[in-house]
Each structure stands twice: as C-alpha cells, then as structure tokens.
C-alpha cells in the first residue's frame, strides 16, 4: 500500500490484494505530499495446508466515527468477496479515538476531563460504529480488556491514552491476547549489538503492538 500497510507472514502468501478505502479526509489541501490514499492490504495465507485470510488496515484519524465505519465496511465487503468461507484476521490502526480528529476543541476537552478520557478506553464501541459493523458481520474484536494502544502527545505536555489498534477475528477463537509496550525501556528482549539494542529514542512507536494467540476453525461463541 502507499501508506505503509503491509502483511508479513512466516507462512506462504498465496494471493494478495490492495483495497482502496473511501476518502474521508483530503490530506492534499494543506499541501502534504502523498501518493495515493488510505488503503488496506488483504492476503490469503497457507497455514500448514489450511487457508487463512488476513488484512492490514489503517483507517482515517481525521474524521468521525461514521467515516471510519464507511472505510471499515469497504474492507469487510472485500473480505467477504475475496476470502469467502475461511477464517479471517483483520488487524491494524483503526483510529477508534471516539472523536473527530479534526476537532481540536474536542481533543482539548477530553484531555482536561478524566471522565471523557475513560470513554477513550472503556466505551469505544459506543462512539465508533466501525466496531459495531464488524460485530454485525460475526467478527470479534480483541484485545477485549480496555487498555491503551496509543499515546497521543498533548500540546501542554503529557499524553492522551487511546485505544486505536485491534485484531478483528472471524472463524477464529482467541485463547489469549494482549498488548506489547513499545517504550524502549520495556523492550528488554533486544539481542546484543542489534539495531534495537542501539536505539536511543524514548519509544519505538507511539502505538503499542497488539498480539493474540488463536485457534482456527472454531466458531466464536458470541
């Protein structure tokens, strides 16, 4: 994809597609130099002789929940068409921040209110119709524990904890799921003399990684 989307797999990739998402924000108007628009990368993997559909997704942050719903529905329709009848894992930064990323006043209001900050972690589905749309098509969102995956810096210092990154599972049952901190101090697994061991920044990313172990071909109880 043109916006950094990719699928990395230890299993053979049999087929792959790029799905263009409906535009919900024009990044060109302020002369940001970009190639293409938001997209998702879908692929079919061969996991020990069993097919598995996967997708790498990055939804728009500078829009409201309805805009993100329209974008995710485009991915859900593509998965139905391209990956029918097989287990599917859709994952990525869905930007489910519970507000319109263009609304600076709303961001300041949330930053100053502990009650509003809690909604960004605990009540995401009430404000983000994309998650409801996925559930309606038999996808299960993980991690289910309300935990931040994004540290959004605030103008006055500090950061706003957001829950933006998800795995959406169809035909899969998660046995466990969690997030992995990308703060450099938490990355104690670096091999000596590796690029990670030499990295001197405060964090590898402002998003934490989302991780899950799943069983294939087991119908979700939900």
Which positions does each model-derived feature cover?
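Short, solvent-exposed aromatic-acidic interface loops
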Residues: 20-27, 60-61, 181-193
């Amino acid at each position: 994809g043109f916006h950094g989307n990719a699928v990395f797999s230890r299993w053979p990739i049999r087929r792959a597609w790029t799905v263009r998402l409906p535009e919900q924000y024009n990044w060109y108007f302020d002369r940001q130099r970009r190639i293409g628009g938001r997209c998702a990368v879908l692929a079919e993997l061969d996991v020990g002789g069993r097919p598995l559909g996967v997708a790498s997704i990055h939804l728009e942050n500078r829009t409201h929940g309805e805009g993100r719903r329209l974008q995710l529905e485009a991915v859900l329709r593509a998965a139905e068409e391209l990956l029918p009848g097989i287990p599917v894992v859709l994952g990525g930064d869905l930007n489910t921040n519970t507000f319109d990323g263009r609304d600076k006043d709303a961001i300041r209001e949330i930053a100053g209110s502990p009650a509003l900050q809690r909604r960004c972690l605990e009540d995401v589905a009430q404000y983000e119709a994309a998650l409801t749309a996925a559930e309606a098509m038999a996808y299960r969102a993980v991690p289910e524990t309300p935990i931040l995956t994004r540290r959004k810096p605030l103008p006055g210092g500090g950061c706003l904890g957001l829950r933006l990154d998800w795995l959406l599972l169809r035909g899969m049952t998660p046995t466990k799921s969690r997030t992995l901190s990308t703060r450099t101090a938490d990355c104690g697994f670096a091999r000596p003399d590796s690029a990670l061991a030499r990295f001197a920044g405060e964090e590898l990313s402002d998003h934490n990684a989302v991780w899950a172990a799943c069983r294939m071909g087991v119908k979700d109880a939900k």
